């Protein structure tokens, strides 16, 4: 009687979590406990990722997400790990289930399957990929941090943008432009939008970046401007993907107010004063007895 081999697997993130944030390089670790192995026998464990809802193999760039591990059993009971690293950018909200098969390689030409664990409903084998949600918060001021500024020819608005949930190593572009609050319309100066952008590679999950807008604000007395921002993921430069935005015309933090021009009172016309002939001035000559020391 040959002892049956039992197989039990648990899939997690590298940190042992059952959820992983969607990203371009995600790793699932499957810990496989085997019992009933024959010492000295060569085995191969083969695993792959399944989409739970579809009950179908996960295919990324036309390929199965799979891996294998070959070992010689040094004990009847062993624990081995198989890792799967793949691009999970588009898998937010999906449950992935790891399937495993164990082969006996005693005859390398004819591997024999001796055990498997393929249960699409098994929670232990399931990992949830969660949506990456990028939060954006912006504050617009002038260079000195003021929210109320003088209208003038050369005005700079600085928008300080706080981003959370970025994917480290990903190239992003922040695009911003100025809106007229009362009109809820883009600010056009000489027929052009007042806009700017900033491209960067995220080196942290949370970052603070600044975008500056310099323009002629001569005609904007009393107007309120609101800065709008959109963040794009440039992983595929041909298809930038908008990942978050902050476009709220009522947002105080994003609003700048230009001061009203002070009303200059019109001067009343002065009545014509008749020209008085110039009185000739005598030169100031020191008078005698004046006590002036000559």
Kindly label every feature range from the protein language model.
Residues 1-12, 20-21, 112-141, 148-150, ...:
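Intrinsically disordered, low-complexity repeat and linker tracts
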Residues 31, 79-88, 160, 208-216:
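Exposed aromatic-hydrophobic patches
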Residues 68-80, 197-209:
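Short proline/glycine- and polar residue-rich coil/turn motifs
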Residues 17-33, 148-160:
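Contiguous beta-strand segments within globular domains
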Residues 35-40, 164-169:
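Short solvent-exposed strand-capping/beta-turn motif centered on an Asx-Ser/Thr pair
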Residues 86-98, 215-227:
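Short glycine/proline/serine/threonine-rich loop/turn segments at secondary-structure transition edges
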């Amino acid at each position: 009687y040959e002892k049956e081999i039992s197989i039990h697997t648990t899939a997690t993130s590298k940190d042992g979590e059952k959820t992983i944030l969607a990203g371009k390089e995600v790793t699932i670790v499957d810990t496989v406990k085997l019992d009933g192995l024959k010492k000295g026998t060569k085995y191969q464990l083969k695993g792959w990722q399944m989409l739970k809802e579809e009950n179908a193999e996960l295919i990324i760039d036309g390929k199965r997400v799979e891996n294998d591990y070959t070992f010689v059993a040094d004990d009847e009971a062993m624990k081995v790990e198989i890792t799967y690293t793949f691009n999970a950018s588009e898998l937010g909200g999906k449950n992935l289930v790891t399937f495993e098969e164990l082969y006996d390689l005693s005859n390398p030409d004819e591997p024999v399957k001796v055990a498997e664990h393929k249960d699409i409903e098994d929670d232990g084998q399931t990992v949830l990929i969660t949506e990456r949600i990028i939060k954006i918060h912006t504050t617009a001021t002038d260079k000195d941090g003021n929210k109320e500024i003088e209208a003038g020819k050369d005005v700079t608005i600085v928008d300080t943008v706080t981003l959370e949930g970025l994917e480290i190593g990903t190239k992003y572009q922040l695009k911003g432009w100025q809106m007229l609050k009362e009109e809820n319309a883009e600010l056009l100066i000489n027929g052009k939008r007042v806009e700017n952008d900033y491209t960067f590679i995220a080196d942290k999950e949370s970052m603070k970046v600044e975008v500056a807008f310099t323009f002629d604000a001569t005609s904007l007395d009393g107007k309120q401007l609101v800065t709008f921002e959109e963040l794009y993921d440039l992983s595929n430069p041909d298809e930038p993907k908008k990942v978050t935005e902050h476009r709220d015309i009522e947002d105080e933090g994003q609003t700048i107010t230009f001061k009203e021009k002070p009303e200059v009172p019109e001067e009343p016309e002065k009545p014509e004063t008749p020209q008085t002939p110039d009185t000739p001035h005598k030169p100031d000559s020191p008078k005698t007895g004046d006590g002036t020391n000559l």
